[in-house]
């Protein structure tokens, strides 16, 4: 097979995402004709990459914000070019003001047209701040959480000021429980848990089935390479899938504040205490810069020999 051109950027990014060695990363990219996701799977099958490495670790700067107004909550992300600007009071005030409007706006397109106190639209206000702050600023995304009855818990990790920080989480608990204070406390605890454990779905049925099948295939091929009999492989794969669910499905994760219990068990206990059904209606978790990729400029010397030969 003729060797295709593999860029230094691709090699370094694959190394950062998987923890594998640079030569192994280059080989994986060559073997998969440069397909990044297939290269990750290739390394995992060879036991060269940690399965738990998550996408979206290349960070951008700025702030996320969480805002709750009764039974409505919103999370937004506004990006800047440097962390220095994220600590700028003018920028922080801008993000807070946008978050306050986002609760009413419901969608990001509508939000951009909403008028701020200055009389300018959100979009115009951002452009003006670009000029005064001196960096490119972007209202990147927003998501809204609404419930008809229950409680919304919010948590912001690495706060620079209240409700603004690196990770913002909302958790909506649908319930007709009378003790709203205890329900809100539970929602807050689950929000802290979500910030720390980064679940991918509420339950296994809502988990992306393509992701599940991808994991199943990786586990199967890795077990096969270990030379196990087919009947043993089937049991091993199902065991590993169950473990995978316990790592990425919120209800199956061990609860941060009571590690001997799953989140589902904690909710069951709360239902007994409060005398009402409790359901996680939705959660939102924004981590600053997740999924944003940057051009790398200072690693060419490190990988030149590998990528050229």
Swiss-Prot record:
Q: Does the keyword Cytoplasm apply?
A: yes
* Region called Involved in Mg(2+) ion dislocation from EF-Tu, residue ranges: 82-85
Q: Which GO terms describe its molecular function?
A: translation elongation factor activity
Keyword terms of this UniProt record: Cytoplasm, Elongation factor, Protein biosynthesis
Where is it located?
Cytoplasm
Question: Cross-referenced InterPro entries, in alphabetical order?
Answer: EF-Ts_dimer_sf (IPR036402), Transl_elong_EFTs/EF1B (IPR001816), Transl_elong_EFTs/EF1B_dimer (IPR014039), Transl_elong_Ts_CS (IPR018101), UBA-like_sf (IPR009060)
Q: Which Pfam families match?
A: EF_TS (PF00889)
* One term under GO cellular component: cytoplasm
UniProt xrefs under HAMAP family: EF_Ts
Q: What does this protein do?
A: Associates with the EF-Tu.GDP complex and induces the exchange of GDP to GTP. It remains bound to the aminoacyl-tRNA.EF-Tu.GTP complex up to the GTP hydrolysis stage on the ribosome.
**What protein family is recorded?**
Belongs to the EF-Ts family.
> What is the name of the protein in this document?
Elongation factor Ts
